[in-house]
Protein backbone atom coordinates (compact mmCIF):
# COMPACT_ATOMS: atom_id res chain seq x y z
CA UNK A 1 0.00 0.00 0.00
CA UNK A 2 2.82 2.41 0.85
CA UNK A 3 4.45 1.69 -2.52
CA UNK A 4 1.19 2.40 -4.38
CA UNK A 5 0.60 5.56 -2.39
CA UNK A 6 4.11 6.80 -3.20
CA UNK A 7 3.63 6.10 -6.93
CA UNK A 8 0.29 7.92 -6.84
CA UNK A 9 1.90 10.98 -5.25
CA UNK A 10 4.76 10.96 -7.77
CA UNK A 11 2.32 10.84 -10.68
CA UNK A 12 -0.26 13.15 -9.09
CA UNK A 13 -2.90 10.41 -9.12
CA UNK A 14 -5.74 10.11 -6.69
CA UNK A 15 -5.27 7.33 -4.14
CA UNK A 16 -7.64 5.62 -1.71
CA UNK A 17 -6.45 2.95 0.72
CA UNK A 18 -9.31 0.49 1.16
CA UNK A 19 -7.17 -2.35 2.47
CA UNK A 20 -5.85 -1.04 5.79
CA UNK A 21 -9.08 0.42 7.19
CA UNK A 22 -11.13 -2.60 6.12
CA UNK A 23 -8.61 -5.04 7.59
CA UNK A 24 -8.61 -2.95 10.79
CA UNK A 25 -12.41 -3.15 11.01
CA UNK A 26 -12.30 -6.92 10.48
CA UNK A 27 -9.64 -7.37 13.16
CA UNK A 28 -11.50 -5.17 15.64
CA UNK A 29 -14.81 -6.96 15.13
CA UNK A 30 -13.19 -10.40 15.11
CA UNK A 31 -11.91 -9.78 18.64
CA UNK A 32 -15.55 -10.16 19.73
CA UNK A 33 -16.80 -12.46 16.95
CA UNK A 34 -14.21 -14.63 15.21
CA UNK A 35 -16.63 -15.25 12.31
CA UNK A 36 -17.08 -11.54 11.51
CA UNK A 37 -15.99 -10.37 8.07
CA UNK A 38 -16.71 -7.59 5.61
CA UNK A 39 -15.94 -10.11 2.86
CA UNK A 40 -18.41 -12.19 0.93
CA UNK A 41 -18.53 -15.94 0.61
CA UNK A 42 -15.25 -16.09 -1.30
CA UNK A 43 -13.45 -14.30 1.61
CA UNK A 44 -11.90 -11.89 -0.89
CA UNK A 45 -14.53 -9.59 -2.37
CA UNK A 46 -16.59 -7.38 -0.07
CA UNK A 47 -20.07 -8.39 0.98
CA UNK A 48 -23.02 -6.02 0.87
CA UNK A 49 -21.97 -4.24 4.06
CA UNK A 50 -18.37 -4.18 2.84
CA UNK A 51 -19.45 -2.30 -0.28
CA UNK A 52 -20.97 0.46 1.85
CA UNK A 53 -17.77 0.63 3.91
CA UNK A 54 -15.80 1.00 0.66
CA UNK A 55 -18.17 3.72 -0.57
CA UNK A 56 -17.78 5.54 2.75
CA UNK A 57 -13.96 5.35 2.57
CA UNK A 58 -13.97 6.54 -1.05
CA UNK A 59 -16.26 9.49 -0.34
CA UNK A 60 -14.32 10.41 2.78
CA UNK A 61 -11.10 10.47 0.73
CA UNK A 62 -12.83 12.99 -1.58
CA UNK A 63 -13.43 15.29 1.39
CA UNK A 64 -17.18 14.68 1.59
CA UNK A 65 -17.36 13.73 5.27
CA UNK A 66 -19.27 16.28 7.30
CA UNK A 67 -21.28 17.62 4.37
CA UNK A 68 -24.95 17.19 5.24
CA UNK A 69 -27.81 16.16 3.00
CA UNK A 70 -29.33 19.25 4.61
CA UNK A 71 -29.20 20.98 7.98
CA UNK A 72 -32.17 23.07 9.07
CA UNK A 73 -32.12 24.97 12.34
CA UNK A 74 -35.01 27.11 13.49
CA UNK A 75 -35.37 29.34 16.52
CA UNK A 76 -39.04 28.88 17.34
CA UNK A 77 -39.06 31.54 20.05
CA UNK A 78 -37.30 34.07 17.84
CA UNK A 79 -39.34 33.01 14.80
CA UNK A 80 -36.31 32.82 12.53
CA UNK A 81 -34.27 30.35 10.51
CA UNK A 82 -30.75 30.22 11.94
CA UNK A 83 -29.26 27.69 9.53
CA UNK A 84 -30.12 26.19 6.15
CA UNK A 85 -27.16 24.21 4.82
CA UNK A 86 -27.56 22.63 1.37
CA UNK A 87 -31.23 23.59 1.25
CA UNK A 88 -33.58 26.54 1.04
CA UNK A 89 -35.99 27.29 3.89
CA UNK A 90 -38.68 29.90 3.34
CA UNK A 91 -42.20 30.91 4.38
CA UNK A 92 -41.54 30.36 8.10
CA UNK A 93 -44.70 30.83 10.14
CA UNK A 94 -44.84 30.39 13.92
CA UNK A 95 -47.99 30.44 16.03
CA UNK A 96 -48.83 29.25 19.54
CA UNK A 97 -49.51 25.68 18.36
CA UNK A 98 -47.96 25.42 14.91
CA UNK A 99 -44.67 26.00 13.10
CA UNK A 100 -44.56 25.64 9.33
CA UNK A 101 -42.03 26.33 6.61
CA UNK A 102 -41.18 25.43 3.04
CA UNK A 103 -38.13 23.19 2.64
CA UNK A 104 -36.38 22.78 -0.70
CA UNK A 105 -33.50 20.31 -0.49
CA UNK A 106 -30.53 20.30 -2.86
CA UNK A 107 -29.96 16.57 -2.36
CA UNK A 108 -31.74 13.43 -1.17
CA UNK A 109 -30.98 11.17 1.77
CA UNK A 110 -29.30 7.87 0.98
CA UNK A 111 -31.77 5.01 1.54
CA UNK A 112 -29.90 2.32 3.44
CA UNK A 113 -30.72 -1.13 2.07
CA UNK A 114 -31.83 -3.78 4.57
CA UNK A 115 -32.22 -6.54 1.96
CA UNK A 116 -30.12 -9.68 1.68
CA UNK A 117 -28.64 -10.46 -1.75
CA UNK A 118 -27.21 -13.70 -3.16
CA UNK A 119 -27.41 -15.46 0.21
CA UNK A 120 -25.08 -12.90 1.79
CA UNK A 121 -24.83 -13.03 5.57
CA UNK A 122 -25.02 -9.26 5.98
CA UNK A 123 -27.07 -6.37 4.67
CA UNK A 124 -25.89 -2.92 3.72
CA UNK A 125 -27.42 -1.66 6.98
CA UNK A 126 -25.04 -3.86 8.98
CA UNK A 127 -22.17 -1.57 7.94
CA UNK A 128 -23.65 1.21 10.07
CA UNK A 129 -22.33 -0.51 13.19
CA UNK A 130 -18.72 -0.05 12.03
CA UNK A 131 -18.71 3.30 10.16
CA UNK A 132 -20.27 6.69 11.07
CA UNK A 133 -21.96 6.96 7.68
CA UNK A 134 -25.24 8.42 8.95
CA UNK A 135 -23.54 11.17 10.97
CA UNK A 136 -20.85 12.06 8.46
CA UNK A 137 -22.55 11.59 5.08
CA UNK A 138 -26.27 10.99 5.48
CA UNK A 139 -27.39 13.67 7.90
CA UNK A 140 -30.62 15.47 7.02
CA UNK A 141 -30.95 17.50 10.17
CA UNK A 142 -33.95 19.31 11.57
CA UNK A 143 -33.54 21.23 14.80
CA UNK A 144 -36.13 23.52 16.38
CA UNK A 145 -35.30 25.39 19.58
CA UNK A 146 -37.48 27.52 21.82
CA UNK A 147 -40.46 25.16 21.94
CA UNK A 148 -42.52 24.60 25.07
CA UNK A 149 -42.15 21.18 26.71
CA UNK A 150 -44.35 18.52 25.18
CA UNK A 151 -44.78 16.38 22.09
CA UNK A 152 -44.89 17.68 18.54
CA UNK A 153 -46.06 16.03 15.35
CA UNK A 154 -43.92 16.35 12.24
CA UNK A 155 -45.78 16.41 8.93
CA UNK A 156 -44.30 16.83 5.46
CA UNK A 157 -46.54 17.55 2.50
CA UNK A 158 -49.58 16.77 4.64
CA UNK A 159 -48.23 13.33 5.62
CA UNK A 160 -47.68 12.51 9.29
CA UNK A 161 -44.04 11.51 9.76
CA UNK A 162 -43.54 11.13 13.49
CA UNK A 163 -43.92 12.47 17.01
CA UNK A 164 -41.02 14.09 18.85
CA UNK A 165 -40.46 15.80 22.16
CA UNK A 166 -39.38 19.42 22.37
CA UNK A 167 -36.04 18.18 23.69
CA UNK A 168 -35.55 15.81 20.74
CA UNK A 169 -36.33 18.61 18.30
CA UNK A 170 -33.98 21.01 20.05
CA UNK A 171 -31.20 18.42 19.99
CA UNK A 172 -31.98 17.75 16.33
CA UNK A 173 -33.36 14.77 14.46
CA UNK A 174 -31.84 13.09 11.42
CA UNK A 175 -34.67 12.86 8.91
CA UNK A 176 -32.57 10.46 6.79
CA UNK A 177 -33.42 7.84 9.44
CA UNK A 178 -37.15 8.31 8.82
CA UNK A 179 -38.18 5.98 6.02
CA UNK A 180 -41.66 7.46 5.61
CA UNK A 181 -40.64 10.96 4.48
CA UNK A 182 -41.44 11.96 0.87
CA UNK A 183 -37.76 12.59 0.20
CA UNK A 184 -36.78 9.12 1.47
CA UNK A 185 -39.46 7.54 -0.72
CA UNK A 186 -38.15 9.50 -3.70
CA UNK A 187 -34.63 8.28 -2.97
CA UNK A 188 -35.94 4.71 -2.73
CA UNK A 189 -37.44 5.01 -6.23
CA UNK A 190 -34.10 6.17 -7.59
CA UNK A 191 -32.33 3.29 -5.84
CA UNK A 192 -34.81 0.82 -7.31
CA UNK A 193 -34.29 2.20 -10.82
CA UNK A 194 -30.53 1.94 -10.35
CA UNK A 195 -30.84 -1.67 -9.20
CA UNK A 196 -33.01 -2.49 -12.23
CA UNK A 197 -30.35 -0.95 -14.48
CA UNK A 198 -27.64 -2.93 -12.66
CA UNK A 199 -29.53 -6.22 -13.15
CA UNK A 200 -29.75 -5.58 -16.90
CA UNK A 201 -26.00 -5.05 -17.30
Please state what every model-predicted region is.
Residues 26-34:
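Short, flexible, mixed-charge acidic loops at enzyme active sites
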Residues 1-19:
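Active-site-proximal cofactor/substrate-binding loop regions of enzyme domains
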Residues 18-21, 54:
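Active-site-proximal beta-strand/loop segments in catalytic clefts of secreted hydrolases
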Residues 20-24, 44:
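Solvent-exposed loop/turn segments at secondary-structure junctions
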Residues 5, 9-10, 27, 59-67:
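Generic secondary-structure signature for well-ordered alpha-helical cores
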Residues 37-201:
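Conserved catalytic region of serine esterases and O-acyltransferases that act on ester linkages
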Amino acid sequence: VDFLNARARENQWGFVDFNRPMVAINQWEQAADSMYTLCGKDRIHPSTDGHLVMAYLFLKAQGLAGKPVADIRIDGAGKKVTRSDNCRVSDLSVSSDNLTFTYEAKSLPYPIDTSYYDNEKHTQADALSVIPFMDEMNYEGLSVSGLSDGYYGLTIGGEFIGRFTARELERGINMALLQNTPQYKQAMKIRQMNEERWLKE
